[in-house]
Design a protein with these regions (language model features):
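Extracellular/secretory-pathway and virion-surface proteins
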Residues: 29, 376-378
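Glycine-rich beta-solenoid repeat tracts in large extracellular/virion proteins
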Residues: 242, 260, 302, 329-332, ...
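Long, well-ordered mid-to-C-terminal structural blocks that present hydrophobic/aromatic surfaces
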Residues: 237-238, 243-300
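Short, ordered "entry" segments at domain starts
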Residues: 88-236, 247-249, 266, 272, ...
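Short acidic-hydrophobic surface loop/beta-edge motif
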Residues: 70-77, 365-373
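Beta-strand/loop motifs with alternating small/hydrophobic and polar/acidic residues, enriched
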Residues: 2-128
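Structured N-terminal alpha/beta-domain signature
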Residues: 34, 51, 218-221, 227, ...
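Flexible, glycine/small-residue-enriched loop-and-beta-strand segment within the central core
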Residues: 284, 288-311, 320-322, 327-330
Length: 379
């Protein structure tokens, strides 16, 4: 009886051993599969980080394209066999930078600012008109102030005394009678946009979509009666008098018109180029990378309403025309509004809100009870 039991136990032990071996092999296979999945995940993550690193490298060294045209292959590590392919193109006054991996079907596209327009580390630069700059109200200047040789006066306007911050002597610099020059190649790009209007076709919201910058640029035009637009990416919208309502959705497009009016409450992103005027309502938020540019008319003009924000550049070029009586101001920024970026006005500007960045002004003024006071900054 005992021999029979032992003889029967041997196959059972063998079966159990085989099952245990299979379980061990299955566990090892799962572990190996997890290692392979992690390796694929890690490789993909590293390639994505490589794309970001290549873009960051370009942002600190734009000379990497020198002699290479608009495309360059970047090798980030000596021991790595893979490269990142960078391509760039102008988009308004910005650049579109696309990074692609030659190892995996991955890409990364960003819109970034171009090279610094000036080597001057200026918070504000006022053209010397043989009169001092006057500060009134709650005006504050943080950073280097390039002012006329006659310096700065701290004064009261309409009974409101100066209660801002005094500018340290060490932060003051002497300006000149001419504004620092700007990159003329960017102006050529704008003219090229304007010359392409004949190729545009009529805009219809039902056909709107986001167009990637790797695709051909879509050229559209809007009628004066149109007010709602849903457009994004690689698209240019033309018109004579464009009106952008709060119901519109714009994501990084370029707009070209004689005049543009952005109605109260609009939130979006775009670069707006006009030849006459650009009117921003109240409570408007133009997120980065946006921009306002007016040039070409006898009296170009930008108005920014209360509680509005512009994240990007604000530029008005009037050819340096003299306007001593301030009949045709170039920029009127209302109190409570904010500009984050470059302000370049070769005419007269009223800065009554906040500017985070640099402001280059041909002249400045404030307005009290319908009267314009030249040479005064007042917040």
């Amino acid at each position: 009886m005992n021999k029979h039991i032992r003889a029967f136990s041997l196959p059972v032990v063998m079966v159990v051993s085989v099952l245990v071996s299979l379980l061990v092999l299955f566990a090892l296979s799962l572990a190996d599969l997890e290692c392979q999945e992690y390796q694929v995940y890690h490789t993909r993550k590293q390639r994505i980080l490589d794309l970001h690193s290549a873009v960051a490298r370009y942002c600190i060294d734009s000379n990497m394209f020198y002699g290479q045209g608009d495309m360059v292959r970047v090798k980030l590590f000596d021991m790595s066999a893979s490269h990142v392919v960078l391509t760039r193109k102008d988009w308004g006054l910005y650049e579109v930078l696309a990074a692609k991996s030659d190892y995996l079907p991955l890409s990364y596209t960003v819109v970034c600012g171009k090279a610094r327009g000036s080597d001057l580390d200026a918070a504000i630069w006022i053209r010397d008109r043989s009169r001092p700059l006057s500060l009134s109200g709650n005006t504050r200047i943080d950073g280097h102030a390039y002012v006329p040789q006659s310096g700065i006066n701290y004064t009261g306007v309409s009974g409101e005394i100066f209660h801002g911050d005094y500018v340290e002597q060490s932060a003051m610099r002497i300006s000149s009678g001419q504004l620092p020059s700007i990159d003329s190649s960017s102006l050529n790009n704008i003219q090229n946009y304007r010359d392409s209007i004949s190729q545009a076709w009529y805009f219809r919201n039902s056909q709107a979509e986001y167009i990637d910058h790797s695709a051909p640029t879509v050229l559209l035009y809007g009628k004066n009666s149109d007010t709602v637009y849903h457009l994004g990416g690689n698209q240019i919208l033309y018109g004579d008098k464009l009106t952008i309502s709060a119901d519109s959705h714009l994501d990084g497009i370029v707009l070209i018109a004689r005049t543009i009016a952005i109605e109260d409450g609009f939130h979006g992103c775009g670069q707006f180029f006009c030849t006459d005027s650009l009117l921003i309502g109240t409570g408007v938020h133009l997120s980065a990378p946006s921009g306002l540019f007016v040039s070409g008319h006898e009296h170009p003009y930008i108005a920014i309403g209360k509680n509005s924000k512009v994240e990007g550049y604000v530029i008005v070029l009037n050819g340096g025309k003299e306007d001593k009586e301030l009949r045709y101001p170039s920029l009127a920024q209302q109190r409570g509004s904010q500009i984050s970026g470059l302000v370049y006005i070769d005419g007269a500007a009223m800065l009554a809100g906040v500017v985070n960045g640099s402001a280059f002004l041909g002249d400045c003024f404030t307005q009290v009870n319908g009267r314009r006071c030249p040479g005064v900054l007042r917040d």
